Amino acid sequence: MPHIESEQQPLAESSNEQPLERLPFPPVTYSHILHCSYHHWQPLYRNITPRSCAIPLSPAFVSYLRADGIVLPPEDATPTDDDNLDTFSEDSSSEEPDPSTEWKEIHAQIKSTIADFGGKVTPKLNWSAPKDATWMAATNDLQCRTPNDIYLLLKSSDFVTHDLEHPFDGCVPDADPGATASDAPTPEVPYHLVLRKYVNFNPSLEFRCFVRNRVLLCLCQRDQNHFDFLFPMRDALRSRIQAFFDEKLRDSFPDPNFVFDVYVPAPHQRVWLVDINPWAVRTDPLLFSWLEILQMKDPIGIREAEEGAEEQFVRLALNGSNAAALEAELDEGSTSESEEELDDEADDDSPFLPEFRLIKRDDPEAYAFTTPQYSAHKLPKEVVDASLSGPGGMSEFLGKWQDILAKQAQESDSENEAQ
């Protein structure tokens, strides 16, 4: 996922500090990753999430997602006279077998859910949506109208592959945070296919929020474009999201550190929970950097720093005359000091405000719409077409590709000899 470097780079507190060799994350446990799985947290917050259905996946379906190549079940179509003409064609015997025969119940449940949700859904697995594979879809987004639309996105996505193959990378067992992943077996993941009713979200009103020690530390917009209308609304949106977090999430989510995404549609009176992500480097910090977030002070850190400063004092040895002079000076300054103390107390009582970062008009990221997202995950159309035609199509494509390379090498050698 894309990262954006922050304008404000974190500063070292002293020149004597050693440079960090790794981000100072607390250990990420297996349970934290599972707590951020959709099937775990969505039942806790069903009333504040968009309408969805989580379908438990069988081992056969998970194996289908993991398998190389893209073989889709035959489409359900109404037969026509033209179809009957091809009933006994030579190609009928060479068709790929229907993979859905091994998970018919799941296939039927997916079709039923699509119908229940008005004919359009968006898919995701436990943690990730196949956003990197939308270039495979005719609509160039996550909108799916048939089961095959869903299968095509899931099997083309590197994000989904990561969910399947590497969900616990960099994690440690819960019993001993000092242990490594090799010290204990990784837990089994109950994989689910999440289908959400398709809603045309306004991307400018989606926000990512970072929580540490059950404190909303900072938040930012998710879409990486400039939206001028957000700036007058910044304080109102921050207040609305803060109240939502305090009431719905702060004390109910199992872990003290996590990242959550919200959607605040017009008229901006209600907040919807869209996703919960791990407090880990795998989660995109978007307009922040993780080092910046990890070094931010929350109310507890600010209070500890102030208490440390108060404990620093100087002992003075005074004789009688010096003591009298000092007492007179203290009497003169008592009024001003009292006023300063009152001001300090007022500052202490002011609420902690999380930083709310938006993309400004002159930021380099302000016009990211000209850059396609997830371009590193895309393949040429010829490769996709070959993979859809089965192993034979891919073999034929590789043969042609080798012929092209050999021809180019031969032409290059001929040019070198001519020179």
Swiss-Prot record:
Transmembrane segments: none annotated. Residues 1-23, 73-102, 328-351 are annotated as: Disordered. GO terms for cellular component: cytoplasm. Keywords: Cell cycle, Cell division, Cytoplasm. Residues 7-18 have a biased composition (Polar residues). It is found in: Cytoplasm. Residues 78-99, 328-350 have a biased composition (Acidic residues). Belongs to the CDC123 family. Regulates the cell cycle in a nutrient dependent manner. This is Cell division cycle protein 123. The lineage of its organism: Eukaryota, Fungi, Dikarya, Ascomycota, Pezizomycotina.
